[in-house]
Every structure is written in C-alpha cells, then in structure tokens.
Design a protein with these regions (language model features):
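Conserved structural position at the C-terminal beta-strand
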Residues: 93-95, 195-199
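Aromatic sugar-binding surface patches on proteins
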Residues: 57-77, 172-182
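Short, solvent-exposed loop/edge segments of extracellular or virion-exposed proteins
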Residues: 7-23, 123-136
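Proline/serine/threonine-rich low-complexity linkers at boundaries of modular beta-sandwich domains
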Residues: 1-14, 103-125, 214
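Short proline/glycine-enriched turn/loop motifs at strand-loop junctions of beta-rich domains
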Residues: 34-40, 47, 145-157, 164-166
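Surface-exposed, short loops/turns at beta-strand junctions within beta-sandwich domains
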Residues: 68, 75-90, 182-192, 201
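Beta-sandwich strand segments
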Residues: 97-108, 202-210
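Short coil/turn motif common to extracellular beta-sandwich-like domains
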Residues: 23-30, 134-144
C-alpha cells in the first residue's frame, strides 16, 4: 500500500500475562512484548511520553523478523520489582524505525502491565505424626500438607516422594489449594515422606514427615 502509514504500532500480547505473580525476591523479570509492526519500544514504571521513557527494549525492526504469529518481538528485562506489592509498568512504541522522526507514529497512550510481587511460600503443617494403626495387613494412611503465604495465600501444588530423589515426586491426589492430601495403603514399618510445594509465582517450599505403621 503506497499510502503513508499514519497508525501507531499496537502491542498485541506479552510473553507473561499482566497481573501474574512473580517469585519472592526475584528483583527482575525477562519479558517479550509482541507488536503488530516493526517498531522501537520503551518502558517505564511511570506513565509518561515515549520520548522520556527511561528503558529501551531490544526490538525486531525489520520486516523479515516477523514471527509465526505475524508479530514482531521486543525483548526486555523489567527491573525494580518489589516483593509483596503490585509492580506497575507502562510500555509505548514508535513505528517505522528507518524513517525520519517526523514520519514515525508513536503511541500516545501507554500499554499498562502489572506484576504482583509475592512472599515466601510456607508449609505450616504435615501429617500424619507418630503412629498409624489398623487391624488389616495394610493400613490406610492419609498424608496431609497445609500451605500458607506465598503468591496467593498458600494456594499451591504439592508433590510427595518416599526417596526425595529429583524425579521421584508424584502429584498429591488432592492439591491446587491450601490443603493437600494423599491416601496410601501401607504395611507395617517406618516411613519417611518428603513434600515439595510450588505456587503460581514459582515460590517453593519443602518439608518431610516421619511416622510408623503398626
């Protein structure tokens, strides 16, 4: 189309959804921003004009750098992320990087983006404690974990293992909440199970439980 481009670039999506939780103590997060045309893009922690935004993204500025979704990628690293609070960022872009400044179209409104700082995930209790008894060859035992804090008040996904080896963990039957349970049918003996829980911000917590079956 030979007619001049008078439309500012549009940010279509981001590699991390806005309002996502981030891990406690992370400080910075790498992000990809996807734009509908070649552009130069910037970000700031304040809503301000493109020309005075402090941070420049590393953007695809050539038509040949289009991705499979027909978008152009900008890479950046969002810094200054604080724990336990909302972290607001603002993005703006300017199109036609090879044209004179007066021919380029710039965003007059920012693309708002938010990351939610979190706190450490805690395992507050594990069960069973002590001894489990029954009057059959196998005794039903309920493993239980209770989690708190973290990205979303303890909501997390927990796994258990009898060895603690990296690939030995199995998702607990009831999880994705603050209480996590798993029924096992065990024979007489001494048992030690390890638990590993991870929340939606990537915070992790581990614990173990030791008990006997009589």
């Amino acid at each position: 189309d030979p007619s001049p481009d008078t439309t500012a670039p549009v940010i279509m999506e981001t590699s991390i959804p806005s309002d996502s939780f981030v891990k406690f103590g992370v400080g910075s997060v790498p992000l990809q921003v996807y734009v509908n045309e070649p552009a130069t893009c910037k970000w700031s922690s304040q809503n301000k004009e493109y020309s005075v935004m402090e941070n420049t993204m590393n953007c695809a500025t050539n038509l040949t750098q289009i991705n499979a979704r027909e978008l152009y990628t900008c890479f950046t690293n969002l810094t200054g992320i604080k724990d336990r609070e909302e972290n607001k960022f603002f993005f703006r872009c300017k199109d036609q990087p090879s044209k004179p400044e007066e021919d380029r179209n710039v965003n007059v409104n920012s693309y708002p983006f938010n990351l939610r700082g979190s706190q450490p995930l805690n395992i507050v209790s594990v069960a069973p404690n002590g001894t489990a008894t029954g009057n059959t060859n196998t005794v039903p035992v309920n493993l239980k974990v209770v989690t708190d804090d973290g990205a979303n008040e303890g909501v997390s996904i927990c796994s258990f293992s009898s060895t603690g080896l990296p690939n030995s963990y199995v998702l607990m039957f009831e999880t994705k909440a603050v209480e996590h349970t798993q029924r096992l049918d065990l024979t007489t003996g001494n048992y030690n199970y390890r638990f590993r829980c991870v929340d939606y911000g990537g915070n992790a917590a581990e614990a173990n439980v030791t008990f006997s079956v009589l």
